[in-house]
A protein has these predicted regions:
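Conserved S-adenosyl-L-methionine
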Residues: 12-138, 145, 162, 170-171
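A conserved structural/catalytic subdomain of Rossmann-like adenosyl-cofactor enzymes
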Residues: 117, 123-124, 128-336
């Protein structure tokens, strides 16, 4: 769907387009619905906002029965409930065009620096009114401060409530953004950390990424349980070939895995099915640490009964082998 958006300067400009199924995942993790107000502080080609708009429109069509009310709600979603900021002029134009082609919603795509030039207000029409954001989605430029966590800090500081889901280079959670992370957790709660497949951006970038999910405007309690999920196997097999139609194949229940991932983050361990205990781990983090956002299930090094039996079996086999060798050598000596 986004094949027309490819452009040659993406590496130079530090722009890596988000796959549409990942954009949809972020939107679901941020709990977007028809009444959400969604913003993105590094909009790129607006893939995340397109996914948000589609989620909002679908929810409206399911829950609103009056045709007139639905038409009004659809217009409101497109005109007032989406906001994006993009600094690069060339990419900004792609975002505008993308939103128009996907059904519009481009009213508040702004060509601004979200870190220095944005005051939290609508861009057009309601430019003196603050945008009441309650959902934040982001795939930031990883070369920015803290791998892009500075965008997260800025956006969350301007929100009064809601949820956020970001995909970012995982070093942001293990030291690269230590001080920023500590500041973020003074006012927001980390709900989940998801390790994504290493080949997620194959052909564009080889960085390891994580998704971090936050509850906004609620200080992180040291006793709060964080969900750590290893999503390295998301069910897709990826290649980097010229024929795009065969570059992404569902080889292991990908749709079901993405659905289960969302349920695990939103509702907890009772939804474990395709995932194993080793891929889902719950524990706490230290809000004063800032480097412990990428935990994984501890490896159990205790030997099992099966391990013990195998060790004994291997030892007895070795003893018998040595005895047989000794007997053979003795018989050879007697024959000389």
């Amino acid at each position: 769907m986004y094949s027309w958006l490819g452009f040659t300067q993406d590496k130079l400009n530090d722009v890596v387009l988000t796959p549409s199924y990942v954009a949809q995942l972020l939107v679901r993790l941020a709990r977007v619905n028809k009444d959400s107000y969604v913003w993105d502080f590094a909009t790129g080609s607006a893939g995340l906002l397109v996914a948000a708009m589609n989620e909002m429109l679908n929810d409206a069509r399911v829950t609103i029965t009056s045709p007139d009310e639905l038409a009004r709600k659809e217009a409101l979603i497109k005109a007032e409930q989406l906001l994006g900021l993009e600094l690069l002029s060339s990419v900004y134009m792609l975002a505008i065009l993308n939103m128009i082609l996907m059904g519009d919603g481009s009213s508040n795509i702004l060509n601004k620096n979200s870190l220095t030039d944005f005051d939290g207000k609508y861009g057009f029409g309601k430019d003196n009114t603050s945008f009441p954001a309650d959902a934040f989605v982001l795939n930031p430029p990883y070369s920015a401060e803290g791998n892009g966590m500075n965008f997260v800090e800025r956006a969350l500081s301007m929100m009064q409530k809601g949820y956020a889901a970001i995909i970012i280079q995982n070093s942001a959670g293990s030291g690269k953004a230590k001080e920023i992370n500590k500041r973020i957790l003074k006012h927001n709660t980390l709900l989940a950390s998801i390790k994504m497949p290493s080949d997620l951006f194959i052909g564009k970038s080889s960085v390891q990424t994580n998704i971090y999910v936050f509850k906004v405007a609620e200080k992180h309690d040291p006793k709060h349980i964080v969900k750590f999920i290893d999503f390295s196997n998301d069910g897709y097999t990826r290649t980097n070939r010229k024929k795009a139609s065969i570059n992404l194949r569902d080889t292991d229940q990908a749709k079901e895995r993405y659905d289960e991932l969302v349920n695990l983050v939103l509702y907890g361990k009772q939804y474990l099915n395709l995932f194993t205990e080793k891929e889902y781990y719950e524990t706490t983090i230290d809000p004063q640490n800032g480097c412990d956002w990428n935990k994984s299930a501890p490896v159990d090094t205790r030997p099992t009964l099966a391990d013990f039996k195998k060790t004994i079996s291997d030892y007895l086999s070795w003893e018998v082998s040595n005895l047989l060798k000794g007997q053979t050598q003795g018989e050879d000596n007697l024959g000389k």
